[in-house]
């Protein structure tokens, strides 16, 4: 985020020059015309002239320069000096470049900047000084650049700012001071920046914010204070930022937020307080934030939610409360959040959710309760959440799913119940989930499935039952799942599959039977595109001839191995997933792959 706007400006500038097809004057000697009429180019640089826009750009990037090149044409509009070994800029070094609008000095060895170094650059709009060794900047450094719109000073060693350093930069929109060593800022640090839209102070050592600091920044839209050492947010600190839309306070040491800390932020849309030490929220923590859309409070130490904490956040769309210490959700814990669409409560210490805890959340689409230890959910606990389409309950110690647990979730599309230690799901537990597309029951302790468990789930496409203890599946168990596309019953204890089990699944394309106790299997349905059979004790007699023929005729559906898809250098050497069909009997073919058996072996069939 720290380099977002500066990087964007760089990219847009480059793209415009490439798209317009400028003429290159690479290697032309100073004072010698290039391949067409145009200005001379310094020997160490490449010059690019845009006829249509009548603009000249000079590229001297990464040339190991220890001093500024001689002979830069006076009409240059953009000068790139990044990635060199410049340790200083002499006074008035650019005084003949009055047309310069873009100057890139980032990635060098600049330890200081002379007050007169930028003399003559009255038309400069974009100045990049990131990734140097700057420790301080003298008053008057930017006195000669009144037209600056963006100034990048991130990733230096600045430990202090002079009062009024930026005074006179009334056109500045974007100021990046991130990733320096600033511990204290003077009251008048940003005096004169009345047009500033984005201010980045992330990655410093700020421990305190005084109300006067942001005085005069009435046009500010985005303020990044993340990754500092702030311990508290006091009242009225941001009261003079009426147009602020995004405020980043994440990854500090904030333990307390004073009542009225965010007063005056009428335009705020995004507030990030994640990765702090906040232990509690008061009823008047968020008053006046009527326009807030996103509130991130994850990775704190919040132990409880007081009633009406969020009462003023009528337009909030995303609330993240994951990785806290919340133990209980009382009735109407989220009162006032009628527009909320995403609610995350994962990895808290939730043991109890009261009936009515989610009342009023009529627009919630995604809810994450995973990583808690709920053990038992009240009947109809999700009543009123008709627009919920994804419910995450992974790793929640549920043990058993009872009827009416999911009553009211008529629009649910995805239900994740992985890793819950489930020993049973009662027959009517999933009834009413007519829109369900994906059901994940992976890594539980299910030993059987009720005959009519999936009744009414006619739209289900993905059913994941791997890593349970299923020894058998009723012949009619999957009958309602006529739209099933993906079925995974791997890592169970299945010894046989009824012949009619898969017959209704005409749309099935992916079937995993890996690591069971199957001895025989008739391939069906006919449209399978991927069939996994590894890890079963196959009896390679006559009943398995049909499977052998299917595997040989459809090698892409029953591959011997598949190379893992990796990004970057994650797979060195390449990783493979094998799909052996290893014979466990009869004795004469033990250890062979079914596909390698000859026709003669099956002649008696």
Curated annotation (Swiss-Prot):
One of its GO terms (biological process) is signal transduction. Plasma. InterPro entries: Cys-rich_flank_reg_C, Dev_Immune_Receptor, Leu-rich_rpt, Leu-rich_rpt_typical-subtyp, LRR_dom_sf, LRRNT. It is found in: Secreted, Extracellular space. SUPFAM superfamilies: L domain-like. Disulfide bonds join 41-47, 45-60, 540-583, 542-605, 566-571. LRR repeats lie at residues 75-96, 99-120, 123-144, 147-168, 171-192, 195-216, 219-240, 243-264, 267-288, 291-312, 315-336, 339-360, 363-384, 387-408, 411-432, 435-456, 459-480, 483-504, 507-528. One of its GO terms (molecular function) is insulin-like growth factor binding. The keyword Nucleus does not apply. Pfam families: LRR_1, LRR_8, LRRNT. Involved in protein-protein interactions that result in protein complexes, receptor-ligand binding or cell adhesion. Forms a ternary complex with IGF1 and IGFBP3. This is Insulin-like growth factor-binding protein complex acid labile subunit. It comes from Homo sapiens.
């Amino acid at each position: 985020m720290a380099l977002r706007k500066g990087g964007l400006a760089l990219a847009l500038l480059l793209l415009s020059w490439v798209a317009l097809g400028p003429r290159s004057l690479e290697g032309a000697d100073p004072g010698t015309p290039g391949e067409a009429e145009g200005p001379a180019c310094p020997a160490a640089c490449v010059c690019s002239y845009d006829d249509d826009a009548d603009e000249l750009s000079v590229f001297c990037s990464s040339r190991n320069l220890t001093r500024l090149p001689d002979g830069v044409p006076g009409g240059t509009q953009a000068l790139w000096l990044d990635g060199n070994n410049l340790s200083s800029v002499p006074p008035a070094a650019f005084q003949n470049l009055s047309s310069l609008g873009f100057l890139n000095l980032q990635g060098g060895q600049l330890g200081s900047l002379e007050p007169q170094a930028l003399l003559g650059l009255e038309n400069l709009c974009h100045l990049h000084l990131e990734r140097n060794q700057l420790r301080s900047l003298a008053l008057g450094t930017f006195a000669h650049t009144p037209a600056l719109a963006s100034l990048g000073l991130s990733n230096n060693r600045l430990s202090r700012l002079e009062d009024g350093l930026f005074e006179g930069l009334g056109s500045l929109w974007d100021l990046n001071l991130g990733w320096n060593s600033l511990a204290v800022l003077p009251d008048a640090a940003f005096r004169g920046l009345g047009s500033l839209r984005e201010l980045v102070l992330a990655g410093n050592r700020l421990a305190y914010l005084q109300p006067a600091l942001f005085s005069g920044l009435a046009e500010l839209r985005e303020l990044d204070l993340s990754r500092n050492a702030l311990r508290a947010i006091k009242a009225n600190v941001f009261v003079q930022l009426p147009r602020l839309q995004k405020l980043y306070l994440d990854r500090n040491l904030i333990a307390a937020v004073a009542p009225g800390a965010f007063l005056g932020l009428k335009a705020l849309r995004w507030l990030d307080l994640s990765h702090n030490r906040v232990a509690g929220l008061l009823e008047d923590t968020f008053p006046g934030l009527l326009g807030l859309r996103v509130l991130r409070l994850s990775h704190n130490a919040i132990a409880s939610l007081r009633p009406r904490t969020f009462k003023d956040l009528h337009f909030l769309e995303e609330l993240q409360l994951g990785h806290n210490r919340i133990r209980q959700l009382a009735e109407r814990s989220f009162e006032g959040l009628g527009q909320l669409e995403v609610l995350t409560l994962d990895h808290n210490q939730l043991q109890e959710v009261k009936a009515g805890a989610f009342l009023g959340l009529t627009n919630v689409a995604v809810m994450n309760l995973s990583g808690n230890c709920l053990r038992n959910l009240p009947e109809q606990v999700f009543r009123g959440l008709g627009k919920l389409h994804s419910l995450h309950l992974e790793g929640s110690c549920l043990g058993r799913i009872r009827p009416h647990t999911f009553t009211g979730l008529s629009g649910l599309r995805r239900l994740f119940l992985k890793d819950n230690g489930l020993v049973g799901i009662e027959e009517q537990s999933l009834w009413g989930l007519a829109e369900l597309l994906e059901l994940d029951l992976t890594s539980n302790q299910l030993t059987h499935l009720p005959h009519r468990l999936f009744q009414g789930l006619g739209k289900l496409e993905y059913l994941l039952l791997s890593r349970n203890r299923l020894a058998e599946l009723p012949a009619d168990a999957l009958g309602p799942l006529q739209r099933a596309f993906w079925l995974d019953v791997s890592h169970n204890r299945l010894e046989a599959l009824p012949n009619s089990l898969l017959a209704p699944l005409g749309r099935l394309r992916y079937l995993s039977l890996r690591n069971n106790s199957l001895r025989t299997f008739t391939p069906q349905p006919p449209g399978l595109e991927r069939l996994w059979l590894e890890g079963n004790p196959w009896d390679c007699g006559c009943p398995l001839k049909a499977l052998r023929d299917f595997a040989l005729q459809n090698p892409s559906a029953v591959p011997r191995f598949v190379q893992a898809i990796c990004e970057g250098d994650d797979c060195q050497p390449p990783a493979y997933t094998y799909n052996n069909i290893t014979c466990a009997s009869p004795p004469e073919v033990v250890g062979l792959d079914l596909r390698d058996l000859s026709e003669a072996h099956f002649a008696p069939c």
